[in-house]
Amino acid sequence: MKLNYTEAWNFIVEERNKFFNEKEDVVQKRWESYFAEAELFGYSKIKGDIKVGEKLHIGSKDREIPDIIICIGNIEQFVVELKQLSFPKTNSYELQLLTYLSHPSLRLPVGVLICEKIYIYYYDHSDGKIINLEIPFEKDNLNGAK
């Protein structure tokens, strides 16, 4: 049974509290399941909506690997970068996400950084303007449920 938006958000908050001190690889597996197996957000791994650990080429080396890329109809929509949930946002985390957004093979306008909070970035490639929304992991948070 599919959850409504508030139920799905509250489930994520409960899970986050359980896994707050886990290492980044555990956090990544959990979020992969949230996007895929649980289908909390309406995406399907089977349909190719979710790409995990896809390598982005720079020169002759595969160096950049976003944690998750969400697609609709085989078109990349946004990238998700995951960090340990107990870690605060840092400039290097933000730079890493913005590097993915501006990568020539992606050039995406939206990125999500998940650490102690969820940060949603809107990046205007034409003027370099960045707007971000900060969403704390709080039960019944209206921004989280959206």
What are these regions (language model features)?
Residues 1-110, 120-146:
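A short, conserved, highly charged catalytic patch centered on acidic carboxylates
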Residues 114-118:
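Short beta-alpha junction loops
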